[in-house]
Amino acid sequence: MILWKRLFHNICIDKMKALFPIKKEYVKKIFDGSKAYEYRKFFCSLEVDTIVIYESRGKGLVVGEFEIADRLCDTPRNIWERTKGYAGISESDFFSYFEGRDKACAYVVGNVNVFLKPKTLQDYGINVVPQNFCYIR
């Protein structure tokens, strides 16, 4: 019975997207392929399969999105060792971000879609920039 519910749930529930504010310098690196990981202190729902990118400290617009290819979670040291080749962030900035944490999370960037015409938050019904992320459909 549980297996059936899980299977039914996966078929019938649309996958969600999450909107992440990401600094302009990191957005550029995601788009040019030099940043293959988006680091966070915790994951959003497993139902999310796409990250929508709000460029903070830049245009202040939604400029693209990427599919989540995988999720990694481990100690900050292990995540850094595994991802440093395409981190797109300095080692000191990485460890500063995760200071005092025993867990680091990383979204593996999959297919990237750069919007030809950037969108506003209002296009998604959002009036305030989320601090970490917000769910959208």
Enumerate the predicted regions with their spans:
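Non-catalytic, usually N-terminal nucleic-acid engagement modules in DNA/RNA processing proteins
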Residues: 52
